[in-house]
Amino acid sequence: MLPKLLTSIFGSRNERLLKQYRRVVERINALEVQFETLGDDELRGKTAEFRQRIAAGTTLDDLLPEAYAVVREGGKRALKMRHFDVQLIGGMTLHNGKIAEMRTGEGKTLMATLPVYLNALTGKGVHVVTVNDYLARRDAEWMARLYNFLGMTVGINLPNMSREEKQAAYAADITYGTNNEYGFDYLRDNMVYEVVDRVQRPLNYAIVDEVDSILIDEARTPLIISGQAEDQTDLYLRINAVIPQLAKQIGEADPRTGEGVIQAGDFTADEKTHQVFLTEDGHEKAESLLAQAGLLAEGASLYDAANITLVHHLYASLRAHHLFHRDQHYVVQNGEVIIVDEFTGRLMSGRRWSDGLHQAVEAKEGVNIQAENQTLASITFQNYFRMYAKLGGMTGTADTEAYEFQEIYGLETVVIPPNRPTIRRDELDLVYKTDREKYDAVTADIRECYERGQPVLVGTTSIENSERVSELLNKAGLPHQVLNAKQHAREAEIIAQAGRPKMVTIATNMAGRGTDIVLGGNVEKQVQLLEADASVPEVDKAARIQTLKDEWQGLHEQVVALGGLRIIATERHESRRIDNQLRGRAGRQGDPGSSRFYLSLEDSLMRIFAGDRVKAIMERLKMPDGEAIEAGIVTRSIESAQRKVEARNFDVRKQLLEYDDVSNDQRKVIYSQRNEILEQTDVDAQIAHLRRGAMTDVVRTYVPAESVEEQWELATLESTLRDEWQLDVPLRAVVDKSDAMSDEDVVERVVTAANDAFDAKLAQVGREQFASFERMILLQSIDTHWREHLAALDYLRQGIHLRGYAQKNPKQEYKREAFELFSQLLDRVKLDVTRVLMTVRIQSREEAAQAAEAIEVRAEQISNVTYTHPNEDGSVSQDAAAASAAEGLPLQQGLRVGRNDPCPCGSGKKYKQCHGKLA
């Protein structure tokens, strides 16, 4: 009661905002006469003037009245269209980072030019986001006439464009594109190996058209880039044939005496650390065997830069043969290797070991070696669009989802009043017992409209229902058009003519979006075709255009007299918003129109949520077959059911976001560090930091922190450093000579030895030449382990709900385990990068450059790349990559995290002490 009383006194939040905006509209209107007197060049010159004022410190808010007045005047001259006052209000709403709800036909496309122009003055770029390629191209080409007139550049971002074309599109003041393409470009930008290969600039300001469709309907499906690394089946098989010829050494040699080996061999296997190491003799034998197998050039070393991957596969195969045992670590079922959980003994179907180990086990067992299809990168629309410094949206239907927009995106919804009052008549729903009765009534209504000449738009919830209605109309002899949201350009032309007399158009909810249905048909298209027709003499064009307009005026008046466009819906959608979108197709800009929903108790929504209640009412009223119930209580009951579904879907999306936020925090860290590495020419500091961490970890395995000498395993540590890291550090001799050597001293001695060995390598090759190789190794390692981490997170997510049965909170468990997995990822990167750089043999500067280039080429050799994304109709598509996409197209830098800022993972530690370790 109290909120209603306060609203009646002070007005609603929406009314107060509109009142505030109307005061600015008065200032814009006052400037109109002044700008009308300016010449075209003077008006265009305002753009340069505004930019100078911004550089001098003027804010966009201060410029807004003048900038909007300039755009309005430019629209009158370039487009022959004048922005209404309500469009100015909508433009202010978008500029303030809110969602503008404007009814269909009120001119959202033209409205967007106001905030787009104003924000583009900063030179930081503005992205206009549409639901499909057709609308992106149409709106860009249409509005470019205005932007170009005012001295602004416009780019279009479409799939299949080359990297250079995309860079040009993003470099423009204003860029039009689809939500999917912007997101994929972001992901691809964070997969490149050179800064110059990125296409996006930092994300500044975006206006999302059909914001409800993009940020709500499509939010449950993340954008995923997946692909297969180059097929190496033959490599695994040939290495697998070499392994039985290598003998395992039994016993560990004492570094000082060489004693302790019971049986000499080619490699040692450490069950404790699950690692294998080739002995010196083993190196020579392995090189000889690999040369015989045609995998290694005669006289080449395993540790040459060109053979880094060969060493990796050799060790994976040795581990598969000697450390992973059938029916203990895995089982073979139906020709597949399935991992056994070492703690529970359960089979882990779908899980695969990383680092090529799984393929090595498959080769060992003689089963089919699966070319692993990895997720290369992934992001949800929620997390992508929240990265923009400012975000605005527009749609005809947002108010029903206002809470979700505010809760998830922090976007307030402002309902913009129509330019003219709406006089559309929304009739009560008609509910029938069966589908057959419902469709009979639909056909009868369509026939009645057709016979009197009134245009009809039949809305369906699926392609299947569209085809069913089409079949019924064919049987009834009623001509019609069917649109299924597949061919956007063609369907836009058809829907534009859906307002002509006797037109019957069947369309799924999404078909023809973004195109107005004008009563009497769309004469503008015909006029454009006539103006472009070179065969018609110029002197005749004006007369023929006037004839077309006169004919249209007659048709328009005829349709208005018949009651305007009739909307017939065959089913209620789960969301009231989608139903409102369909209704909004009629009654544009004060035109007449009517709408009615035909339902049956067999409809899915009715059957699940409202059927019993309505059925009871029908039985109580003893309704005969073919008779419909029409009552406000029934419509309210159905809307109540829709609210339940909307609430459930909101919970699903919110839960998805809570889980994705975990990986999103980690994504920010990885992408931020990746971009730092890309932008630096010298990564010595990072490499040195990783080397110290790796050497410390190695030492701590055998010399625990704060331990005494009796607990140290120095002999094993020395052999590990020699075999795995190619470091000869005589620790035992040093310890024996020292009176008081601590475990920290051992760490420092090993770190110093590693630094000295690395510096010697740099001196031989040259620091500058080796820097590029270091950078490539670091990037490749991050990318490889990040992909494996994404797969591990996906696997964790699939089964985490089962923790609820153990009285544990699944979300908390997911956060905890995801944090552990991420820590392991950083450790693996640290060890891998250090191991490669310590053991690789590069003799010259040329060899270093060739090795860096080879790594970059190999990293981009991802085959069968697919792009998974949601469609407008709610389905999910997997598209094969375009050639340009396979090149590794780019995106913007990830959000930067300061070294002393709190870590985004939520641990409470500083970033540099937590997940900033790589930097």
From Swiss-Prot:
Q: Which SMART domains match?
A: SecA_DEAD, SecA_PP_bind
The residues the record assigns to binding Zn(2+) are: C903, C905, C914, H915
Q: Which Pfam families match?
A: P-loop_SecA, SEC-C, SecA_DEAD, SecA_PP_bind, SecA_SW
| Claim: Nucleotidyltransferase is one of the keywords in the record | no
Keyword annotations: ATP-binding, Cell inner membrane, Cell membrane, Cytoplasm, Membrane, Metal-binding, Nucleotide-binding, Protein transport, Translocase, Translocation, Transport, Zinc
Q: Which GO terms describe its cellular component?
A: cell envelope Sec protein transport complex; cytosol; plasma membrane
Report the cofactors.
Zn(2+)
- An example Gene Ontology biological process: protein targeting
The top EC class, named as a word, is translocase
MF (Gene Ontology)? ATP binding; metal ion binding; protein-exporting ATPase activity
The EC number on file is 7.4.2.8
Co-factor binding comment: May bind 1 zinc ion per subunit.
Q: Which reaction does it catalyse?
A: ATP + H2O + cellular proteinSide 1 = ADP + phosphate + cellular proteinSide 2
Mode of membrane association = Peripheral membrane protein
Compartments, record wording:
Cell inner membrane; Cytoplasm
Q: Where does this chain mainly localize?
A: membrane
Q: Which PANTHER family match?
A: CHLOROPLAST PROTEIN-TRANSPORTING ATPASE, SECA INNER MEMBRANE COMPONENT OF SEC PROTEIN SECRETION SYSTEM
Describe the family membership recorded for this protein in Swiss-Prot or TrEMBL: Belongs to the SecA family.
Q: Which HAMAP family match?
A: SecA
SUBUNIT field: Monomer and homodimer. Part of the essential Sec protein translocation apparatus which comprises SecA, SecYEG and auxiliary proteins SecDF-YajC and YidC.
What does this chain do? Part of the Sec protein translocase complex. Interacts with the SecYEG preprotein conducting channel. Has a central role in coupling the hydrolysis of ATP to the transfer of proteins into and across the cell membrane, serving both as a receptor for the preprotein-SecB complex and as an ATP-driven molecular motor driving the stepwise translocation of polypeptide chains across the membrane.
**Protein name as catalogued:** Protein translocase subunit SecA
The record lists the organism as: Leptothrix cholodnii (strain ATCC 51168 / LMG 8142 / SP-6)
